[in-house]
Amino acid sequence: MEKAIRNFLSQESAGGILLLVAVALAMLMANSPLAGLYQGFLGTEVQVRVGALDLHKPLLLWINDGLMALFFLLIGLEVKRELLEGALSSVAQASLPTFAAIGGMLVPAGIYLLFNYGDPVTQAGWAIPAATDIAFALGIMALLGSRVPVALKVFLLALAIIDDLGVIVIIALFYSTDLSTISLIIASIAIVGLVALNRKGVTALAPYGVLGLVLWVAVLKSGVHATLAGVIIAFCIPLRAKDGSSPSEHLEHSLHPWSTFLILPVFAFANAGVALGNMSLNTLISPVPVGIALGLMLGKPIGVMLFSYAAVKLRLAQLPNGIGWKQIAPVAAMCGIGFTMSMFIASLAFEQADPMYGDLARLGTLIGSILAALIGYFWLSKVLPKQGV
């Protein structure tokens, strides 16, 4: 039994399976007699007081602001590694996934705005279908095992990382609220300290952790979303020490299982519970869920393929060795798996609006992501060579 559990946890697909279980459990509880317990649990006030510092938020916001900051720390570490040493470290390697990611963000956002034209409240959700859930997309691809060429995995990983970088910029520019000058000054001082540690060649993670915590609290209080603190911390942690070791990769490897098996499933459970009982057919086909679902299911693959094809034809990029358009197309469909990232943006976009909009956004995300996952999986399975061929 223990061996079976260890084998499951070692598989790349395990994270995607756990996310599905978390989503299913959240939907079950939100649409059962346990709905009150589910909502009450997420609404539980949690207070942390240290001297004059007093933080009190519902559990849901601790998950979205705290746990997701750790997830974005991991994303930041991955982005930095790929930019300096990995699949994005040269123009030739980065060109195709960069153009693909840009198209995969612009076209879904355009489709969403097309359906929500003229409504300033719902237009705030334009970035929801622009996101890709890197963990879930790679998990779905991993279900096909060794049939998937390494170059195709690298393409999806690079594309998703650039997509994440785009999401980080979007959050910073478009989803920050009224700013606190004092908190921003404290955050700036913490950033200067983190940069100084990096420049001095400090490789111990503890000093980065202390200043990082100060930065997170300051950013949380500043009006800029707290998850951005995780990215800043990641960019300041050294990739290589003088002895050749990598503090950044060590932390990345330590965070990966926590992210896969705790942070993302907990986030999905906390945010995916949509009560369907009070929704009519007209509500289900309203502009918000339709715009998100079509943005993910159609906009993502169209944008990725259109911009990739144009970049190759204009000789701005080239296809990976041994990979053709028939393999790129189903991967483009998989990019429509928005899940946790899209839900996260939805929580920011409609934070001040009627809760109904958040429910509609999550519903659209679930529908679009599940359809994108199914289409991408079966399409890729069809075009890849059979096992042993």
Curated annotation (Swiss-Prot):
Keywords: Antiport, Cell inner membrane, Cell membrane, Ion transport, Membrane, Sodium, Sodium transport, Transmembrane, Transmembrane helix, Transport. The chain crosses the membrane at residues 17-37, 59-79, 95-115, 124-144, 154-174, 177-197, 213-233, 261-281, 287-307, 328-348, 363-383. It comes from the Bacteria. It catalyses: Na(+)(in) + 2 H(+)(out) = Na(+)(out) + 2 H(+)(in). GO terms for cellular component: plasma membrane. It holds the Pfam family Na_H_antiport_1. GO terms for molecular function: sodium:proton antiporter activity. One of its GO terms (biological process) is regulation of pH. NCBIfam families: NhaA, PRK09560.1, PRK09561.1. Na(+)/H(+) antiporter that extrudes sodium in exchange for external protons. Belongs to the NhaA Na(+)/H(+) (TC 2.A.33) antiporter family. This is Na(+)/H(+) antiporter NhaA. It comes from Shewanella sp. (strain MR-4). The gene is nhaA.
